[in-house]
Amino acid sequence: MKYVLKLLKYLVLASVTILVAYVGMTTFPEPMFDHRVVYRNYEIWSDQSIPPQISNVLDDVNRRLVRSDLQGENKKFKIFFCNASWRLWLYGQHFSDQVGADADTAVTRNIYVRASDIASNRILPPGGGDLADAAQRPLSYFIAHEAAHIIVARQFGRLVSFRYPEWLMEGYADYVGKGGDFDFDENYRLFRIHSPQMDFQQSGLYRGFHLRVALLLDKQGWTAKQIFEHPPSDNAMNALLTKFATSPKSADSH
């Protein structure tokens, strides 16, 4: 019995040590990235040299972030380009190297981005295939999307992912990230015919979530603060989407 208790004690101690080490590594990842550039409100780190076109990418990120009425003064972010996939797996929040980008919204303002062609403002998709909705989702989209998550977390609490529905968290980040490059009428048409592109489980895209947020912000006149303070239920959102189909404005726009 004493042996078992001693073993359990060592296991608990080892687990705590590993956890503390991991938190330390992810909170202060800079030593694992050799290249650094500072531009405006961004500190950029990478495991490869950073081309000068990063300034164009970040200017476009800031253009997209203007879409957020939650954006305040002095929003500073650290961006880490993980060209080696193991870095994205380790530092991202999902222990996966398949994501486009990820962000730590609870402790830091760190954004982790997969291998990218910075000069061309695009990420390199997992597996080397084509990126869905690539025209609307350049590299600057992914950075702005994750920055939007951080902005929301600073406004409404570090554990927002546990407080709000997925459609709101990802829909708002997609709304901000796309910087206005979203055809509401076309996506609403796809929604009405039950297109797989509007179903996140089928497409992996946030179009359906974005449509909900765009309806509230652009058609119903809500502010982002109002949505996050009083998020509509799924049933309420479905009712609003259905009602919009029969509204005079909707009829005029189709």
Give the location of each predicted region.
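Sec-exported extracytoplasmic/periplasmic mature domains
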Residues: 66-70, 148-157, 174-182, 214-222, ...
